[in-house]
């Protein structure tokens, strides 16, 4: 952090400590994720897919640190991947059921791209928003938005 922000190490340490003081549940999540990984040898996504971490108990601090970062990140990133895949299947099925000609053509992280017929645009938007926001029920709402354009740049 000190290097990235071009600030003294002591100041970056204060920023990090202040962050975790403000958001203690994040530190608790991180610690718990590492502990679970050390006990089980893996972490899980929201749909129980496993990410095995064979180096989580390594004696090499660099190797272990990499595995610990994966123990923290994999459940979050993997769960996001799980959720978008559920939404994609549901969107595809709705398009089929409703006889739409528009097609899903690309997924990039948390984005979906479609080729949409103009006369189907509003229906496609409604389906996509509904399925993206309701792919799973969480304690916090999933919020989606739609952009449109003749190319990806315009759609953003």
Predicted regions and their residues:
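Conserved catalytic core of nucleotide polymerization and phosphodiester-bond processing enzymes
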Residues: 2-156
